[in-house]
Amino acid sequence: MKPLDRIHEAAKALDRHIILPEGEDPRVAEAARRLLAAGLARVTLMGGPEIPGAGRIDPAGGPDLAELADHWHRMRAARGMTAERALTEMRDPIRQAAMRVRLGQADGTVGGAVATTADTVRAALQIIGKAPGAGIVSSFFLMLSCGPGAPVRGGMIFADCGLVIQPDARELAAIALSAADSCRRILAEEPRVALLSFSTAGSAEHPSLGRIREALALIRAAAPGLEVDGEMQFDAALDEAIRARKAPESPLTGRPNVFVFPDLADGNIGYKIAERLAGLTAIGPILQGLAKPANDLSRACSVKDIVNATAITAMQTK
């Protein structure tokens, strides 16, 4: 079974409740229909058409709007939030969906078909917040290589390709640990993590490599049982024969399923090269490190993108 098919089957079994806050967008409404038809999730739309089997909330006038606004007011009062402003801001469907997830009314939310990434991520950070023990909220792309003639088949996690611009050593370690956890949840595989660089096992020296080496030490201290190595060039990480020559002492066994890029520039360029030249399917960015799942879509997303992001959001609740 292909990785995405496994994810869909697992999402069906979980039967999670996901809020889609941009129900007025036709793509979101159609995605809700497909999610319900496939049994991938229970769905509530904010705004938009009435869809059989889906919940629907008017974000501007729901019966519990004042209660939600009161929660938001109390959360932000120390930062100058007034009751009037809290009520206005809680009419925003992205914020309101995040608050409903925070309060346990739904298991997760997927937005960004209309709203900007900045607005979607800000709502998740401010309202849902970080998971206990998470050093940083970051993101990953699920990369699927399943086409005919693909040299590598299966699913892989690429992180961070969408959020943290220039992580320091502690942030890079946190990204890697979150990505390893995402691998377990989404791919149902034990993670094998490669910290990518232009150097393999000390083949080059540059001040920037110290950050990766420090991150590796932090990861090993935090998760001594995790299979992880770096710094490592991509070819050495991917190809066991090359790795045996360049890094014969590497503890990695087999092909890594988690690739951690040193910064956002490398990660963003890398996933797009893999997608556009190698034909991999890229799903994301998926946020990781939040207390409860909330995810962002590209404003250029397709109905299929929304369906897949929702299935992955359901998987993040495990």
Curated annotation (Swiss-Prot):
Primary location: cytoplasm
GO terms of biological process kind: acetyl-CoA biosynthetic process
GO terms of molecular function: phosphate acetyltransferase activity
InterPro entries: P_Ac_Bu_trans, P_AcTrfase, P_AcTrfase_dom1, P_AcTrfase_dom2, Phos_Acetyltrans/Butyryltrans, PTA_PTB
GO cellular component: cytoplasm
Catalytic activity reported: acetyl-CoA + phosphate = acetyl phosphate + CoA
Keyword terms: Acyltransferase, Cytoplasm, Transferase
Pathway in which this enzyme or protein is active: Metabolic intermediate biosynthesis; acetyl-CoA biosynthesis; acetyl-CoA from acetate: step 2/2
Subcellular location: Cytoplasm
E.C. numbers: 2.3.1.8
NCBIfam families assigned to the protein according to its UniProt record, in alphabetical order: PRK09653.1, pta
Family designation: Belongs to the phosphate acetyltransferase and butyryltransferase family.
PANTHER family (UniProt xref): PHOSPHATE ACETYLTRANSFERASE
The name this protein goes by in its record: Phosphate acetyltransferase
